């Protein structure tokens, strides 16, 4: 997603680049090996495709402890529809948690259904009938579209892949290597029958930097004259992410994906609400931050998601607290949606404060550059400074006190921190409690994360009046107690 049309607004230039690359008429491969593979796979005949499957998935970036495997989900039904001509894809996934520990925000007992889309340079989720823009998903979904078996060959031809012979485990492959500029790099392994058997790709990631992804296609069958694998496995960042058994394939199925106007017009919105003297709630999107003004500097709690969110959030902090450097950024926990903006914080010159288990993981991650799409950290040339919290740490300038506490015994993350301002009686937390709509009834069964948060507040004897959640709105603490069916203290 490089801005190849410099005078357009960034989001329009992005879309124009993608469409310019993906809406061209089919090109013929210059290399005979790609020609043979295209003929074997019926690539030019496949304009759209839909396939359904079931199996196992894993929630990338949501490990219970840093470095552990991604949490497992059981996929009951999976449907993917692709229009290669418009670079559009729709995934419909029905699943249930496969294990208790780890993140993802999924119910602990009930099944969930996700509808995830991408078209050109835009991504969104469909929640009932409402589209929810998701710019942070564009890169990942475009990558997934173009590493499908037919997509990989189309992308290899379009990007003038270099082709060589290679032997692996006694088998000879035609190996095509190409780059989708600003998106990903890929190496496609084509077997002796001309079928795509493996794609090794690298994608930019807000936490890990350039990240290896390995996708394996096997047990091909003929579907209406088109070969397609019935087994798909994938790993990313060193751990499995997918294991599918494909049940049905429909080449050239009707695929009608319309980009909603709301998604096309969406921009990154950042707001600031003063909740106490020198304390600002930075909101406006799916993830929040908090700015805490000290005597001669600013402490920021959370730089989430990626540069697209973190950079304007930090700019908003400088706007509401002018003239003081952002010296410290506190990370609530290691899950990637909450740590994806830490590279931007390092580029800002801030010291990262995180739970002790995260430090070696973050040090390795931040030392691995994003070269495919350079981020703020890569451009800055700075090195990360990381300090830690085990169970408790206090930041003070002699006037304001900021307490950092480990959230013990959580099922969500073993590296959870919450931030407490005793004078202001404010609690800042992520994922332990996300407030529902105002006046909504409590769930029939209390959320274990809510119960765990109350247990920690009571164990530590924290006197809280309001909660500043890193998802959702500022609420009085009584809403937490109401959510678990208990009177507030």
Which residues does each predicted region cover?
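Gly/Pro-enriched, hydrophobic low-complexity segments
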Residues: 169-260, 417-422, 429-430, 435-436, ...
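Flexible, processing/modification-adjacent segments and terminal tails
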Residues: 32-35, 107-186, 192, 203-209, ...
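Bacterial N-terminal signal peptides that target proteins for export
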Residues: 2-16
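Active-site metal-binding motif and surrounding structural segment of the metallo-beta-lactamase
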Residues: 308-353, 459-463
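Conserved beta-strand hairpin/beta-sheet module of binuclear metal-dependent hydrolase folds
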Residues: 273-319, 416-435
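Zn-dependent metallo-beta-lactamase
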Residues: 241-295, 393
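N-terminal mature ectodomain segment of secretory-pathway/periplasmic proteins
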Residues: 32, 39, 43-131, 159-164, ...
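Divalent-metal (often Zn2+) His-rich catalytic cores of metallo-beta-lactamase-fold enzymes
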Residues: 233, 454-489
């Amino acid at each position: 997603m490089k801005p190849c049309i410099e005078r357009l607004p960034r989001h329009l230039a992005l879309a124009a680049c993608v469409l310019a690359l993906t809406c061209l008429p089919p090109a013929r491969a210059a290399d005979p090996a790609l020609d043979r593979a295209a003929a074997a796979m019926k690539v030019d005949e496949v304009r759209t495709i839909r396939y359904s499957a079931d199996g196992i998935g894993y929630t990338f970036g949501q490990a219970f402890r840093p470095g552990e495997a991604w949490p497992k989900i059981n996929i009951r039904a999976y449907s993917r529809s692709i229009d290669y001509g418009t670079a559009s894809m729709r995934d419909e996934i029905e699943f249930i948690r496969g294990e208790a520990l780890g993140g993802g925000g999924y119910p602990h007992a009930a099944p969930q259904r996700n509808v995830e889309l991408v078209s050109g340079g835009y991504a969104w989720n469909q929640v009932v009938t409402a589209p929810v823009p998701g710019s942070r998903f564009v890169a990942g979904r475009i990558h997934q579209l173009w590493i499908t078996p037919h997509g990989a060959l189309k992308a290899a031809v379009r990007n003038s892949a270099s082709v060589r012979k290679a032997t692996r485990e006694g088998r000879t492959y035609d190996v095509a290597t190409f780059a989708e500029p600003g998106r990903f790099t890929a190496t496609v392994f084509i077997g002796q029958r001309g079928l795509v058997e493996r794609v090794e790709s690298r994608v930019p990631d807000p936490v890990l930097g350039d990240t290896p992804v390995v996708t394996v296609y096997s047990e091909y069958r003929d579907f209406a004259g088109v070969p397609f694998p019935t087994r798909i496995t994938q790993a990313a960042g060193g751990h499995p992410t997918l294991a599918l058994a494909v049940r049905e394939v429909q080449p050239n199925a009707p695929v009608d994906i319309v980009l909603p106007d709301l998604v096309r017009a969406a921009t990154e919105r950042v707001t600031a609400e003063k909740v106490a003297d020198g304390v600002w709630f930075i909101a406006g999107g799916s993830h929040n931050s908090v700015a805490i003004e000290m005597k001669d500097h600013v402490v920021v709690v959370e730089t989430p998601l990626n540069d697209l969110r973190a950079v304007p959030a930090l700019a908003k902090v400088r706007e509401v607290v002018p003239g003081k450097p952002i010296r410290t950024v506190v990370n609530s926990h290691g899950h990637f949606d909450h740590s994806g903006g830490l590279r931007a914080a390092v580029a800002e010159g801030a010291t990262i404060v995180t739970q002790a288990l995260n430090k070696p993981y973050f040090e390795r991650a931040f030392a691995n550059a994003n070269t495919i799409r350079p981020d703020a950290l890569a451009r800055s040339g700075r090195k990360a400074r990381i300090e830690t919290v085990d169970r408790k740490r206090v930041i003070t300038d002699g006037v304001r006190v900021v307490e950092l506490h480990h959230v013990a015994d959580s099922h969500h993350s073993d590296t959870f921190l919450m931030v407490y301002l005793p004078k202001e009686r404010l609690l800042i937390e992520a994922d332990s409690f996300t407030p529902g709509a105002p006046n909504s009834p409590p769930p029939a069964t209390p959320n274990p994360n809510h119960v765990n948060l109350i247990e920690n507040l009571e164990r530590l004897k924290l006197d809280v009046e309001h909660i500043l959640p890193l998802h959702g709105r500022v609420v009085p603490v009584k809403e937490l107690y109401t959510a678990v069916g208990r009177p507030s203290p």
